[in-house]
């Protein structure tokens, strides 16, 4: 399947330079969205019924958007979201199942001719080795390839919106060593759940970099987001002992004081999706409601990004490899 036009002039990405945002580390999604008017605009959020996805949906719905949530667990999603105010629809979506992705995109297209915001929020982290029906490693398949295929299938709706934004949830986990495109599915090396997570999160950031490069001519801009440390169901594959060893919890089970609430964790996603400060910009990695700076290699606990997620050649290769893996030629 072919999507889009392969012959479009590309441009340089926006610089990784903070914009002195009025919001910051402890800002909440509702604070970011308070002055935003999304009335009549369709927004798609994957996994918008758990963790920071829930607060992303709450804030964007509160701004007047018509929300479509892609949910692997529909019944649970309805339990969570039914009490919310606003226009919120829930549709089945399994990001590890190509047919489910296509069906979801078709259902979205039946509801609207345009999508103004796509938030690729759903993720799994540090899971035991598992493979999808194609044999692809599950973290890479779910976190990156599923969202790549979804963006490709929704591309005509994004391009039709006039100023659409795509928000790709990355993580500080991108700083775990590298992205091995010669063996992304751990077929020739021992599986490491953290390396698998790190390369999937690197792929999310590189996806945003390349999508922005290709989509700018169509008015579609993309952003990568590190939401911060938040205690959510994302940690479900980790034991409490593992989380204590990483300093996330103390011996009494109290979460580290630097962790954000789920509403604070959703703030940067909402900021990237809506902030007027970002007009004319894209392809950047953001954290704490601002564009991030390069990480200090001597301080592994500091914020910021590592250079490989700004590597345009790596982003281009990942894009081409992703097209091959999902069988979709995605050329905006």
Give the residues covered by each predicted segment.
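Rossmann-fold NAD(P)H-dependent dehydrogenase/reductase core
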Residues: 4-244, 248, 324-332
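C-terminal helical subdomain
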Residues: 17-22, 200, 248-301, 310-316, ...
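Pocket-edge positions in alpha/beta enzyme catalytic cores
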Residues: 69, 93, 257, 307-310
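A signal for specific C-terminal beta-sheet/loop modules enriched in small/flexible residues
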Residues: 101, 303, 307-308
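A short, mixed-charge helix-start or loop-turn motif at secondary-structure junctions
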Residues: 189, 193, 251-255, 303-305
């Amino acid at each position: 399947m072919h999507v889009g036009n392969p012959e479009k002039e590309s441009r340089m990405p926006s610089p990784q330079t903070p914009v002195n945002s009025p919001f910051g580390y402890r800002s909440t999604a509702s604070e970011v969205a308070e002055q935003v008017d999304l009335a009549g605009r369709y927004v798609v959020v994957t996994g918008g019924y758990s963790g920071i996805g829930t607060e992303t949906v709450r804030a964007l719905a509160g701004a007047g958007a018509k929300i479509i949530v892609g949910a692997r667990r529909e019944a649970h999603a309805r339990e969570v979201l039914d009490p919310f105010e606003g226009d919120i629809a829930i549709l089945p979506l399994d990001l590890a199942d190509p047919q489910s992705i296509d069906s979801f995109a078709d259902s979205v297209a039946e509801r609207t001719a345009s999508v103004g915001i796509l938030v690729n929020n759903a993720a799994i982290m540090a899971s035991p080795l598992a493979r999808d029906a194609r044999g692809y490693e599950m973290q890479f398949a779910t976190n990156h390839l599923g969202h790549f295929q979804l963006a490709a299938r929704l591309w005509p709706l994004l391009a039709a919106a006039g100023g659409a934004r795509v928000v790709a949830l990355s993580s500080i986990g991108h700083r775990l060593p590298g992205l091995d495109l010669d063996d992304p599915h751990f077929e020739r090396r021992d599986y490491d759940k953290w390396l698998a997570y790190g390369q999937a999160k690197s792929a999310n950031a590189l996806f945003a970099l390349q999508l922005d490069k290709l989509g700018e001519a169509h008015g579609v801009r993309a952003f990568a987001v590190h939401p911060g440390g938040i205690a959510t169901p994302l940690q479900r594959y980790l034991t409490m002992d593992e989380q204590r060893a990483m300093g996330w919890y103390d011996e009494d089970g109290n979460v580290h004081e630097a962790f954000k609430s789920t509403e604070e964790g959703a703030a940067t996603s909402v900021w990237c999706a809506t902030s007027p400060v970002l007009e004319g910009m894209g392809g950047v990695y953001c954290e704490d409601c601002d564009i991030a700076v390069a990480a200090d290699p001597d301080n592994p606990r500091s914020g910021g990004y590592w250079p490989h997620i700004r590597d345009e050649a790596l982003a281009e290769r990942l894009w081409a490899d992703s097209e091959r893996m999902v069988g979709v030629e995605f050329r905006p």
